[in-house]
Amino acid sequence: IKLADKQALMGMKKSKHYTLLAHADDSNNRKGFMRNAVGFELSKMIGMTYTPNAKPLELVLNGDYVGLYFLTENIRVDKDRVNIVEQEDEETDSEKITGGWLVEIDNYDTDPHITITEGGDVYTMWVTYKTPGVLSSQQEAYLTQQITMLDKLIYGDKNSDELWQYLDMDA
């Protein structure tokens, strides 16, 4: 949602940008809603550095009930949100491309993104990059390699501790 002027919707901080989070994995909205609600609360309880504010709402559009959604803050790089040092667009120095990423794994093919296909077209994952805005071939290769590796570790050998070498649980 992009507003013309900053507004404080549902008690959240004033902003021009908000997100309507649908529960697309669930035809009756209840399971998806509960998963998202638990995820937001768990994130706050364990002290994650940033958890977007989220307020549940029932969406009615032109008099038709659409469903149950969350209205959330738009996730972006900011000292009060995702506080990272952003990479330069089209960075080619391999020492400078290992951090400063804001990405989103999506169910849809939206630009700007990279596409990761695993297992001979068994599934496709779209990774939308928010920052940097324009990728060099080195940045794209690095991001593809990192996401592919994490995906294999997450869904691979459940008895392996290798995944924990790549996750900073204190961040």
Where are these regions (language model features)?
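Phosphate/dinucleotide-binding and metal-coordinating scaffold of catalytic cores
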Residues: I1-A171
